[in-house]
A protein has these predicted regions:
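Alpha-helical transmembrane segments and their immediate juxtamembrane cytosolic regions
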Residues: 1-330
Length: 330
């Protein structure tokens, strides 16, 4: 479920904010600040945290062989969850490059209706299915030789980033009719229930996580189709419905939003030890999941909040107080 919509939503929102930020700051300053905000934390955590962890786990006989094994695994042990930041850097650079060489004024895209959303969904399903003829789910490659990428899900991530930029140009989040959002929220929830039903009720060989990870057959079509419906349905529905319901931010939500980036970077280093500590007790998996989820959220956001009190870390994670521009004397 997370792969079907969670990360896609993050790329959609990231794409939404790129055009306005780039235009306000200019391409050079935009890329420079994006490197400071995204690239520097990625490099620091990759080499200061993830690399020692990978070395401790692998215990390689030679460093050269270790580097080769990292490349064969698409650098994933070096990036871990931070591959998302690598993609944001690439997509941001691609946007700036496109704006630089397209030579066209920004275009305002009309708000999509049911037909446009359905056409996008069918196109996403088709492209995803075709790519999975060659690349199965959870098969990773080093994109441009340096960034881990999962081709089976790349169409979703790239297309939603592009749609986010288009949504900003057309002011879709404000002009999207509530009825369209509610309808597609229903579509996304229905497809999600189908995923759960296939996983829980189908025979072992046909459960969702064992349903063809790729190939030409109908199981791959079913999986690609369900993921496409969940992605489009919830991406449209959640954003529109939440905007209708929440007219002013709650203090807790605002505080969490301010530290969400830091919490994302830190959460893996918190979640994995918690999972390992409760792996042995013979208790309900649902209870284990609930305990890990609650503790992970509390500790991740707590650590992100506390990072704002450590000078070097708060600069790295962006959790320091916002800078107030100096007033110019007349």
């Amino acid at each position: 479920m997370n792969a079907a919509v969670g990360l896609g939503l993050l790329f959609l929102l990231a794409g939404y904010f790129v055009p306005q930020t780039c235009e306000r700051k200019g391409p050079r300053r935009f890329l420079r600040e994006r490197w400071t905000r995204i690239g520097v934390p990625l490099v620091v955590f990759a080499f200061a945290a993830n690399l020692p962890i990978a070395l401790a786990v692998e215990q390689p006989a030679s460093f050269g062989g270790f580097v080769g094994s990292l490349y064969d695994d698409a650098w994933r042990p070096l990036y871990l969850h931070l591959w998302f930041l690598g993609h944001l850097m690439l997509y941001s650079a691609a946007y700036v490059t496109w704006r630089r060489f397209s030579g066209r004024a920004p275009h305002s895209w009309p708000t999509p209706g049911h037909r446009s959303i359905l056409a996008f969904t069918l196109g996403l399903v088709g492209v995803t299915w075709v790519i999975r003829w060659w690349y199965s789910v959870d098969e990773w490659v080093p994109l441009l030789w340096v960034v881990p990428a999962e081709p089976a899900r790349l169409p979703q991530y790239v297309s939603l980033f592009v749609l986010g930029a288009m949504a900003y140009r057309g002011d879709w989040l404000r002009t999207m009719p509530s009825g369209v959002g509610r309808t597609w929220l229903g579509v996304g929830l229905a497809a999600s229930l189908c995923m759960v039903a296939v996983q829980m009720l189908a025979p072992d060989s046909s459960r969702y996580n064992q349903l063809a990870n790729g190939g030409l057959g109908w199981p791959s079509v079913v999986r690609s189709g369900l993921e496409g419906l969940v992605c489009a349905g919830l991406a449209v529905g959640v954003l529109v419905v939440v905007q209708d319901l929440v007219h002013r931010p709650l203090r807790l939500v605002s505080a969490m939003a301010a530290t969400s980036y830091a919490a994302y970077i830190l959460h893996v280093y918190i979640v994995v030890p918690i999972q390992a500590s409760i792996a042995e007790p013979d208790v309900s998996p649902f209870l284990k999941f609930s305990v890990v989820a609650v503790l992970a959220v509390l500790l991740s956001f707590g650590a992100a909040h506390l990072s704002g009190r450590v000078p070097g870390i708060r600069r790295l994670l962006g959790t320091g107080p916002p800078r107030v521009p100096e007033a110019t004397s007349s």
